[in-house]
C-alpha cells in the first residue's frame, strides 16, 4: 500500500484537477454544476472514487450522468498532471454526506422538541 502522505497528496491533486476542469474546461452546462467534495484512492492506486455534490441536490442524478459522459476528458486532464505510474480509473458517486448531516440535524430538532 502506498504511504498515507503520498495517497493524501494524490487525492488532493485529483480533487483540484477535476474541480478545475469541471469549472473551466468542460462545455457541458449540467456537468459544470458538479463539485468534487472528496476523493478516495484504492490501496493499489488503480481506482479513484470521486464524491460529487451540486448546489441543487435534486439535480444530482442528471449531473452524475453528464459527468460520467465527460469522464474520459477529465481523465486526460488528470493524466497531464499525474506523476505516478498509471492514471487511476475514475468512478464518480453522489456525496451523501450533506443528506446524512441534514437527517441528523432533523433528529436533534425532534429530540429537542420532545424535551420541551
Curated annotation (Swiss-Prot):
The record's subcellular locations are: Cytoplasm
**What does the entry list under GO cellular component?**
cytosol
Show which residues constitute the signal peptide: none
Q: Which Gene3D superfamilies match?
A: 3.30.300.20
User: Could you name the domain of life of the organism this protein comes from?
Assistant: Bacteria
Single Gene Ontology BP annotation:
maturation of SSU-rRNA
Primary site of residence: cytoplasm
Q: Which Pfam family, any one, appears in the UniProt record? A: RBFA
On whether Transmembrane is a keyword of this UniProt record, the answer is no
Which UniProt keywords are listed?
Cytoplasm, Ribosome biogenesis
Q: Which GO terms describe its molecular function?
A: ribosomal small subunit binding
State whether it acts alone or in a complex, and with which partners, per the record.
Monomer. Binds 30S ribosomal subunits, but not 50S ribosomal subunits or 70S ribosomes.
Q: Which HAMAP family match?
A: RbfA
Q: What does this protein do?
A: One of several proteins that assist in the late maturation steps of the functional core of the 30S ribosomal subunit. Associates with free 30S ribosomal subunits (but not with 30S subunits that are part of 70S ribosomes or polysomes). Required for efficient processing of 16S rRNA. May interact with the 5'-terminal helix region of 16S rRNA.
Q: Which family does it belong to?
A: Belongs to the RbfA family.
How is this protein named in the record?
Ribosome-binding factor A
Gene it is expressed from: rbfA
